From Swiss-Prot:
Belongs to the GTP cyclohydrolase IV family. Pathway: Cofactor biosynthesis; 7,8-dihydroneopterin triphosphate biosynthesis; 7,8-dihydroneopterin triphosphate from GTP: step 1/1. The keyword GTP-binding does not apply. This is GTP cyclohydrolase FolE2. It is an enzyme of class 3 (hydrolase). One of its GO terms (biological process) is tetrahydrofolate biosynthetic process. It catalyses: GTP + H2O = 7,8-dihydroneopterin 3'-triphosphate + formate + H(+). Its EC number is 3.5.4.16. Pfam families: GCHY-1 (PF02649). Converts GTP to 7,8-dihydroneopterin triphosphate. The lineage of its organism: Bacteria, Pseudomonadati, Pseudomonadota, Gammaproteobacteria, Enterobacterales. Disulfide bonds: none annotated. The record marks C157 as: May be catalytically important.
Amino acid sequence: MNKVALPPTQPLPDAQAWQGAMSDVGLDWVGMQGIALPLELAGKPLMAKVNAGINLRASRHGARGIHMSRLYLTLDELTQGELTPQRIADSLRAFLASQPEHSDSASLSISGELMLSRPALLSAHRGWKAYPLKIDASLTTGLTLSLTVGVPYSSTCPSSAALSRQLAQQQFQFDFEQAPDKVSQQQVIDWLGEQGMPGTPHSQRSWAWVTVTLNEGEAELPVVNLIDRIEHALGTPLQTLVKRQDEQAFALANGQNLMFCEDAARRLYRMLRSQCHHRAFSLRVEHQESLHAHNAVAELSWQEAGNAA
């Protein structure tokens, strides 16, 4: 390859600083998407993808573009310890400080999957489960910070359960119609164990997506606490390692927590209002149907009076 002679003292051209033909047209957001960063959240590693950007103000003498490398360099601060609201806010302020002549608004989006070790329902085993999450932060006159988590769970259809119980009743009547008054307890027990479920209710893997707007001054991102509360409210979180005793306990949990998507959404609403005390929240539940070729979905949102989040 031919060598190129570069004058050692000549400054490098900065094309971004040149005034473009339409530099009087501002841009709402300019930045980078899909930046890979190794972060730490809740004391655990998080292989994250980050979107980072700022606005570009309109000006007759404005710049053609922003210096994205300055934003990239400031992101390294996020990797230096536990991811906290303060660390995120500091990064956003550094975005604005890196090019104050062009911008007065900065934003950051962090997404990934947090791995948590979860115990089995009864046996002395544990397994790992991945929880998708997203953190959205913006800084203009103040900091706005929201946390979204996805929690998988099982849902058994109440209507299908009722239809299945009716089938069991009908089958029992048919099998013992010859001598209904002479059926012993042991016969009933044997029948239930061998033929007591002529039909089974349908259930499906389901997802709860919950977004909360954090209060000012929160020291930590309450991701594990939020996941735990969602799972407790629903009662049927998906399992990891399962032995037969755990599977039976899971069947019992599903039977005791029959849910339409509307029921699941209302359970989460009551939990978030009574236990979490965030400025605002929204939620979406998806029952990925095993009966239908479509999903059953319910959505709900709330914000405290006077909050514009």
